[in-house]
């Protein structure tokens, strides 16, 4: 999964990305 460092992203977004990454992997 690609993590984009944008001020607009919130902690929840990071968690969602991590969860999605686990699902894909």
From Swiss-Prot:
Keyword Nucleotide-binding recorded: yes
Keywords assigned: ATP-binding, Chaperone, Nucleotide-binding, Stress response
Induction: By heat shock and primary alcohols.
One GO MF term attached to the UniProt entry: ATP binding
Family: Belongs to the heat shock protein 70 family.
Function: Acts as a chaperone.
Stated name of the protein: Chaperone protein DnaK
Organism: Acinetobacter calcoaceticus
Gene behind this protein: dnaK
